């Protein structure tokens, strides 16, 4: 897995808002240019994406602007995950593809679609999630579950073993990127 922070972050002063910047007329990330270019993102005044406080790899405060992972499963299936946060409009990219001998499944989180393709049959399917079922709300859902668990008002929707397994996968992915080789993912033994 590789993660990069090459686009955002930079030399602008910390806590700089677009409305305070003398480059807002030609900065592609300013609210007026996001509106003019229909490039998406927050169209109200916001912190500068090129400020020192946006993060950088050198000091461990990386603000990811893209990530990729190549996965190989025991069955021989391969998977690819990618997210490119600075890609906009029709080029927006965040998803995963897993292909085995019998078929391929592709997740497109920007379009809220799941594609299933059977390799040896003339059938394919596309499932579309409603707009309120977006993948992008995951962090707030995790926080909601955590608060409910602490307060004793709800049961978690996901077992702790799944969270630990996810952490193991992330640690293995980081080691794989650092070492430039495949790394076995430690398994949960609960």
How would you label these PLM feature ranges?
Residues 1-112, 142-156, 185-190:
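Contiguous beta-strand/loop segments that form the cofactor/metal-binding neighborhood of enzyme cores
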Residues 169-179:
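Short arginine-rich
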Residues 56, 129-137:
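A short glycine-threonine-serine/GTX helix/turn-capping micro-motif
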Residues 128-131, 149-166:
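Glycine- and charged-residue-rich phosphate/anionic-cofactor binding loop of Rossmann-like
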Residues 96, 112-124:
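Short polybasic amphipathic segments
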Residues 164, 178-190:
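C-terminal lid/capping helical subdomain adjacent to the catalytic/cofactor pocket in oxidative enzymes
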Residues 107, 125-126:
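Hydrophobic/basic alpha-helical segments enriched in Actinobacteria
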Residues 139, 143-144, 170:
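A general structural signal for well-ordered alpha-helical segments in protein cores
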């Amino acid at each position: 897995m590789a993660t990069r922070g090459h686009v955002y972050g930079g030399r602008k002063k910390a806590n700089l808002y677009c409305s305070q910047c003398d480059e807002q007329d030609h900065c592609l990330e300013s609210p007026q240019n996001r509106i003019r270019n229909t490039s998406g993102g927050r169209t109200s005044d916001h912190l500068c994406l090129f400020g020192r406080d946006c993060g950088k790899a050198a000091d461990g405060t990386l603000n990811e602007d893209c990530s990729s992972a190549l996965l190989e499963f025991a069955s021989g299936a391969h998977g690819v995950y990618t997210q490119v946060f600075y890609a906009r409009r029709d080029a927006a990219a965040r998803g995963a593809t897993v292909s085995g001998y019998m078929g391929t499944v592709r997740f497109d989180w920007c379009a809220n679609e799941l594609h299933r393709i059977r390799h040896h049959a003339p059938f394919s399917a596309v499932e579309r999630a409603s707009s309120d079922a977006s993948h992008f709300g995951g962090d707030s859902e995790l926080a909601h579950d955590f608060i409910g668990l602490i307060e004793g008002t709800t049961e978690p929707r996901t077992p702790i073993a799944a969270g630990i397994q996810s952490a193991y996968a992330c640690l293995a992915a980081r080691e794989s990127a650092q070492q430039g080789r495949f790394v076995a993912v430690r398994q949960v033994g609960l």
